[in-house]
Amino acid sequence: MKKLKFLLYPISVLYSIYSSFRNLLFDFGLIHSIEYKIPTIGIGNLSTGGTGKSIIVDYLIEKFKKNKKITTLSRGYNRKTKGFVHASKSSDAYEIGDEPFQFFSKHPEINVVVCEDRRKGMNIILKNLSDTELCIW
């Protein structure tokens, strides 16, 4: 365990420096967060797998789908397509990714979309799926 700590310590220092620098860019207004016209819920670190995000997304869908028109937005990890894809009855895991396919199969009444560029995906949702009341990503 000591060897692992020794090996990971330099990585943690680099990550800390990166995070601090990025936070400074936000503080000085050089980069900005984006506000959308609809509520959004972002779950965890979108680039790290195996952290339980899908379970939380599924829980939130169950909790809100009776009262809100929900759209989920995912990058569609491991899918064979590119760009924005709106899940349909003919969609499969190759087209939209395994987790979005799981959400669509379990909750066909919600919109499930994938787009590797989250900002682009949200802009398309706002334009083409204007009945969306809550977006979970």
Language-model regions, residue ranges each:
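ATP-dependent carboxylate-amine ligase catalytic core
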Residues: 4-7, 11, 48, 65-137
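N-terminal, well-ordered alpha-helical segments
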Residues: 12, 19, 41, 58-62, ...
